[in-house]
A protein has these predicted regions:
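Non-catalytic tandem-repeat scaffold regions and their flanking low-complexity/translocation tails
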Residues: 4-298
């Protein structure tokens, strides 16, 4: 298996003589963004340079001039990156943005789209938190917001549809009454199968639907969440194992005992061998295939 090379970003002790490359590299680290205060005044006041920094990450705004924290173009650029997580989230520097922009719809939508600003009740002005039209837009670009919207909106078909269409997993946060809504369920699961685990049983027993979804997006598979009757189905199991042999982990004994399916699964992902029936693991042909595939995957 090819090793992933980890590239360390160089960090500098910034001062008035630091160049742009050193500043960008250092400020891109949240732990060292405060070094921005030490750079020369010309660059510290240079809006164009601040726009360049905003392309890296937005946390530097905590240490930038107040006027830049009120600059809509700059702030939106700082919010554009989607690599924020719970540790590097928008909320880490949201309070540094001026109040006017924190109440601006364009800015809020951009923040929500970063996927880290989920608990919107803590950040949205009251009038926008209860604004159905605006919330509908928010869940389109930041579907995980559905978890924190007003409970009445979790009952709203349009809002929930927009969220699950963007990310099927957010079906988890919909009001249970909407789990009987065919339009909503299909919006969640039809593209990639995400959200299948929250769908009613009849969808998990629908072979035609399962095959259609599995063939449409071969990088993912809802096999884990299908009804046992479909997991046993040879056609379904064959397709699931060809997508990712790890699906053998979720397979019933009838599939774990099947030599043809085992072969397909191992060729797709050698880890499938671990989940085969013990007798099949001892099969000479299966062991040969596993050893061969495993050799070239290392």
């Amino acid at each position: 298996m090819k090793k992933i090379e980890i590239i360390e970003i160089p960090i500098f002790k910034l001062n008035k003589n630091s160049n742009k490359i050193e500043i960008k590299s250092t400020v891109s680290s949240m732990d060292h963004a405060k070094e921005l205060k030490n750079i020369n005044e010309k660059l510290y006041n240079d809006r164009n340079f601040m726009l360049e920094l905003a392309e890296e990450q937005g946390y530097f705004l905590k240490y930038a001039k107040t006027e830049f924290c009120c600059d809509k173009e700059l702030v939106i650029k700082a919010l554009t990156k989607k690599d924020f997580n719970n540790e590097r989230g928008v909320y880490k520097f949201w309070d540094s943005i001026c109040e006017t922009l924190r109440n601006d719809k364009d800015v809020i939508l951009k923040a929500v789209s970063s996927y880290s600003m989920r608990n919107i009740e803590n950040y949205f002005p009251t009038e926008l938190f209860f604004d159905k039209k605006f919330i509908s837009k928010c869940v389109k670009v930041g579907p995980h917001c559905l978890e924190f919207v007003w409970s009445e909106f979790k009952l709203d078909e349009t809002i929930v549809y927009n969220a699950v269409k963007s990310n099927g997993y957010t079906l988890e946060y919909a009001d249970p009454s909407l789990l009987n809504n065919h339009k909503v369920i299909m919006a969640a699961i039809s593209d990639s199968g995400f959200g299948y685990e929250y769908a009613p049983l009849k969808y998990k027993k629908d072979k035609t639907l399962a095959l259609k979804i599995m063939k449409k997006n071969k990088s993912t598979s809802p096999y884990e969440y299908l009804d046992i009757s479909l997991k046993k189905d040879f056609e379904i199991a064959k397709l699931a194992m060809s997508v990712n042999g790890f699906n053998m982990f979720y397979a019933p004994s009838e599939v774990k005992n099947n030599k043809e399916l085992a072969t397909i699964a191992i060729k797709s992902n050698p880890s499938a061998y671990e989940y085969l029936d013990k007798k099949l693991q001892k099969d000479k042909e299966i062991k040969k295939i596993y050893n061969l595939v495993n050799k070239y995957s290392d």
